[in-house]
Every structure is written in C-alpha cells, then in structure tokens.
C-alpha cells in the first residue's frame, strides 16, 4: 500500500498538492503546523478540508517554539506585512527555519506511518524570495533525512517548477479549481478565498488566477508539457 504525508497548511499550494496526492496514493496523511502564525485561521481551514477530502489522518502539531525563535511579520502581529524586501534581500514574511522544521517533522511522521513519501507545495518559480522553497534546499533536506533515519524517503515537490497560473491549471485538472479558490486560505491577513487582495500572497495568487482564466487552453498546454518532462 502506497502512503504519503502532505505538509498541509490549508492554502492554495498545499491543497492542490493534497488533491493530486489523493489520486496517486492509497493513503494520504496530512500534517499541519501551529507555530503561532499571524494567519492561524489556516489551521481551522486545514481541518475542514482534511475532513471534506477524507484524508486517512490529519495531525495538527504544536510547534510554537518556532514563534519564539523566528521573528517575522508572520509570527508577530506588531510587524506589518510589507511588499518591500528587507535590507538582507528577503521578504519580512520569511520565517527562518520554518521549512527545515516542517520537513524534519513530516519526515519523522512518515517514518512512524511507514510512508516513503513526503509532499510539500514549495515552489522555486514563484518562491516569493524564500530560500527554503528552492529545489537545492529540498534535495539537501531529503539527503539529510535519509541519512539520519537510515530509510529511503522521497520529498516530492509537484509545484517546484510551476508558476501560479500553472498551479491553478493543476487544480482545474482535478476538477478542483472552485474548491481551491473558495475554500482555501492563502492570505497573510487570514481571509479565506480570494483574501485581502493586497498582501504579497494574495497578489501572487490573484495574478496567477487572472492569467489562467484569461487563457486556460494555453496554460493547460504549458502545464502538460512540464508534467511530461
């Protein structure tokens, strides 16, 4: 029996990955992390989606220690979300070590479940300037987890080379565009669906959707070409 663990925030990207995984694996388990995030409404959204999509299991893990260590606009309500980069060239929504921690814990959870695959929705094409969304980082994490647990483990990144328009096309491929558009939470200000429309996450999501809806056939063809390679 094939099993996978999906790092599941309840946002557009992880929900799209989850829907795809349900078509590819016998058992799909979700893991969601509560790190005291600004947009923690996403946790309740993830719970609702996990129930509605009938996951084999859904674990919400308390990792609020990360909030104490990582100062970011996503971990401090007192820091406004900015569309400008900081002096170090990173967005102020970057949470240092977040994906290191998430993938480590997801790998441990997969080990306990007997799953050989961890799936995450990180993307280098539209990676918002986050260094822990890059392919080289994911490869390094996979190698470290395999060495550290002496177990074959694959970290799949279905969206790694897709732009946001192609990610919408992928959701549509599985007849889930409206579900992803209306029932997920990507907004840094915690607003479901199309969100606030002004934060970096909403702007990226909106541009991708507009591009996809303007020329579905071309974007679907582009997605198919990438999936074949």
From Swiss-Prot:
Q: Does the keyword GTP-binding apply?
A: no
Query: Catalysed reaction(s)?
Result: 7-carboxy-7-deazaguanine + NH4(+) + ATP = 7-cyano-7-deazaguanine + ADP + phosphate + H2O + H(+)
Look up the record and name the pathway of this protein: Purine metabolism; 7-cyano-7-deazaguanine biosynthesis
Residues engaged in binding Zn(2+): 187, 196, 199, 202
Q: Per the UniProt entry, what are the Gene Ontology biological process annotations, in alphabetical order?
A: queuosine biosynthetic process
Top-rank taxon = Bacteria
For the ligand (ATP), the binding residues are 8-18
Entries under CDD domains matching the protein: QueC-like
Q: Which Pfam families match?
A: QueC
Free-text remark on how the cofactor is bound: Binds 1 zinc ion per subunit.
GO MF terms held by the record = ATP binding; ligase activity, forming carbon-nitrogen bonds; zinc ion binding
Q: What is its EC number?
A: 6.3.4.20
Q: Which UniProt keywords apply?
A: ATP-binding, Ligase, Metal-binding, Nucleotide-binding, Queuosine biosynthesis, Zinc
Required co-factors = Zn(2+)
**What is the main EC category here?**
ligase
The family line of this record is: Belongs to the QueC family.
Which NCBIfam families does the UniProt entry name for this protein?
Answer: 7-cyano-7-deazaguanine synthase QueC, PRK11106.1
Which HAMAP family does this entry report, sorted A to Z? QueC
What is the annotated role of this protein in its UniProt record? Catalyzes the ATP-dependent conversion of 7-carboxy-7-deazaguanine (CDG) to 7-cyano-7-deazaguanine (preQ(0)).
Write down what this protein is called: 7-cyano-7-deazaguanine synthase
Q: Which species expresses this protein natively?
A: Shewanella halifaxensis (strain HAW-EB4)
Q: What is the lineage of its organism?
A: Bacteria, Pseudomonadati, Pseudomonadota, Gammaproteobacteria, Alteromonadales
């Amino acid at each position: 029996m094939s099993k996978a663990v999906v790092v599941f925030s309840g946002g557009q990207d992880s929900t799209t990955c989850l829907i795809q995984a349900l078509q590819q694996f016998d058992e799909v388990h979700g893991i969601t992390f509560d790190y005291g995030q600004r947009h923690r409404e996403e946790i309740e959204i993830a719970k609702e989606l996990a129930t509605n999509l009938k996951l084999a299991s859904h674990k919400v893990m308390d990792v609020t220690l990360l909030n104490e260590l990582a100062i970011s606009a996503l971990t401090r309500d007192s820091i406004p979300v900015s569309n400008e980069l900081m002096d170090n060239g990173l967005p102020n929504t970057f949470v240092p070590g977040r994906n290191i921690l998430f993938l480590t814990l997801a790998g441990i959870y997969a080990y306990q479940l007997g799953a050989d695959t961890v799936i995450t929705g990180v993307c280098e094409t539209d990676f918002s300037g986050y260094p822990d969304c890059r392919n080289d980082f994911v490869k390094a994490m996979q190698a470290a987890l395999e060495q550290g647990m002496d177990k074959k483990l694959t970290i799949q990144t279905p969206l790694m080379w897709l732009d946001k328009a192609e990610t919408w096309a992928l959701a549509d491929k599985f007849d889930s565009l409206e579900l992803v558009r209306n029932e997920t939470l990507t907004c840094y200000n915690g607003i479901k669906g199309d969100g606030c429309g002004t934060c970096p996450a909403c702007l990226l999501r909106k541009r991708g959707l507009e591009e996809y809806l303007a020329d579905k056939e071309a974007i679907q063809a582009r997605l198919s070409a990438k999936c074949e390679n």
